UniProtKB/Swiss-Prot annotation:
It comes from Emericella nidulans (strain FGSC A4 / ATCC 38163 / CBS 112.46 / NRRL 194 / M139). Residues 93-450 are annotated as: Catalytic. Optimum pH is 5.5. SMART domains: fCBD (SM00236). Residues 59-92 are annotated as: Thr-rich linker. The keyword Transmembrane does not apply. GO terms for biological process: cellulose catabolic process; glucan catabolic process. This is 1,4-beta-D-glucan cellobiohydrolase C. Keywords: Carbohydrate metabolism, Cellulose degradation, Disulfide bond, Glycosidase, Hydrolase, Polysaccharide degradation, Secreted, Signal. Its EC number is 3.2.1.91. GO terms for cellular component: extracellular region.
Length: 455
């Protein structure tokens, strides 16, 4: 993938302004120089050697389940769900899984904005503070990009359960990205993952999925929306000429199959990542893409919880644009609306009645500053886009969403770094940039200044 969101450590941190860190803020880890104690009601919990986070002190991840009769019922998941120690794994999701829910505000992203971004808005930039505060409240997906982050899913779902039990109306749904394939990011370097196929990576990945499944079963009364493995399947459509991708093909397919079958649960809706218009929207790529995604769906037994595909994740394409930008190089399928409407019939013809979600987190300014459509790293001239909504105007599109947390880097511009990718050093990439997933203040400012609609 071109980035790894919600990184394990925050880069370019200013000295801590407060003696105590806020709930869900970072409180420790290798190289951390900020506050190491938490506000009342929170405890500093070490997730790994790089990252510790202030989590609710009363939070428990016990696998002992209690029975409830006050489960959430919505138009997208008929019937109530009872939390018991024995769950029948027969997915029942139908209809738009976003309908009837409000989306969870990512606490980690919110803490980045509150504890890093806003204090850094000084001088002439101080006028952006209200917009930054508003951006922190926009729901975005939580990235489970290393196995060590999986326990945070339980923490956040416990918080959602508590808010729903307190009468949240509409009830809250959680949003997560499953992103830890072995030999991840096979066609780039910026977001190489923790598992290697040559070192038991497939089994490590299955263990990672099992941990996620256990949490989803425990919180079966909480509605959860998942994006599955950004870039992975799209790489199998176009990049098998890259040795790492060719070597990873069978592992990617096996692991994706395992993910969508094991996570096929009544409280879950899944979307496979499907690249974007500038990747798979070319005439030569549409049918091969449809063949691959329909095959994955069929090979997994047509899981009821596999709702469809996610597009434009961490990218910049417009949802709908009147005039194709010059960098789209003459492809008439130059926005995400045209892309999904070109792909959907090809999928349907093979038995996959897919619906879609599109990431609008960074596509607010059109055209962008891209010099080439394939330039993906920290692109200049971008802005926050449409807020998450089911008011899409297209029956194929379930929702606009923010999958990529805006302000987290796509990759480092440091040419000496192990994960340096040349795209992050291009003239249309904002520089200097920190490692993928870490906070990039200048990029956040750019997104705020170019936001459309503005905050």
């Amino acid at each position: 993938m071109h980035y790894s969101a919600s990184g394990l450590a925050l880069a370019f941190l200013l000295p801590a302004i407060q003696a105590q860190q806020t709930l869900y803020g970072q409180c420790g880890g290798s190289g951390w120089t900020g506050a190491t104690s938490c506000v009342a009601g929170a405890a500093c919990s070490t997730l790994n050697q790089w990252y510790a986070q202030c989590l609710p002190a009363a939070t428990t991840t016990s696998t002992t389940l209690t029975t409830t009769t006050s489960s959430v019922t919505t138009t997208s998941n008929p019937g109530s769900t009872t939390t018991t120690s024995s769950v029948t794994v027969t997915a029942t999701a139908s209809g738009n899984p976003f309908s009837g829910y409000q989306l969870y505000v990512n606490p980690y992203y919110s803490s980045e904005v509150q504890s890093i971004a806003i204090p850094s808005l000084t001088g002439t930039l101080s006028s952006l503070a209200p917009a930054a505060t508003a951006a922190a409240k926009v729901p975005s997906f939580v990235w489970l990009d290393v196995a060590a982050k999986v326990p945070t899913m339980a923490t956040y779902l416990a918080d959602i359960r508590s808010q729903n039990a307190a009468g949240a109306n509409p009830p809250i749904a959680g949003q997560f990205v499953v992103y830890d394939l072995p030999d991840r990011d096979c066609a780039a370097l910026a977001s190489n993952g923790e598992f290697a196929i040559s070192d038991g990576g497939v089994q490590h990945y299955k263990d990672y999925i099992d941990s996620i499944r256990e949490i989803l079963v425990e919180y079966s009364d909480v509605h959860v929306i998942l994006v599955i493995e950004p870039d992975s399947l799209a790489n199998l459509v176009t990049n098998l000429n890259v040795a790492k991708c060719a070597n990873a093909q069978s592992a990617y397919l096996e692991c994706t199959n395992y993910a969508v079958t094991q996570l096929n649960l009544p409280n879950v809706a899944m979307y496979l990542d499907a690249g974007h218009a500038g990747w798979l929207g070319w005439p030569a790529n549409l049918q091969p893409a449809a063949n691959l995604y329909a095959g994955v769906y069929s090979d997994a037994g047509s899981p009821a919880a596999l709702r469809g595909l996610a597009t434009n994740v961490a990218n910049y394409n417009a949802w709908a644009i009147d005039t194709c930008p010059s960098y789209t190089q003459g492809n008439s399928v130059c926005d995400e609306k045209d892309y999904i409407n070109a792909l959907a019939p090809l999928l349907r013809a093979q038995g996959f009645d897919a619906h879609f979600i599109t990431d609008t987190g960074r596509n607010g300014k059109q055209p962008t500053g891209q010099q080439a459509w394939g330039d993906w790293c920290n692109v200049i001239g971008t802005g926050f886009g449409a807020r998450p909504s089911t008011n899409t105007g297209d029956s194929l599109l379930d929702a606009f969403v923010w999958v990529k947390p805006g302000g987290e880097s796509d990759g480092t511009s440091d040419t000496s770094a192990a994960r340096y990718d040349a795209h992050c050093g291009y003239s249309d990439a904002l520089q200097p940039a920190p490692e993928a997933g870490t906070w990039f203040q200048a990029y956040f400012v750019q997104l705020l200044q170019n936001a459309n609609p503005s905050f």
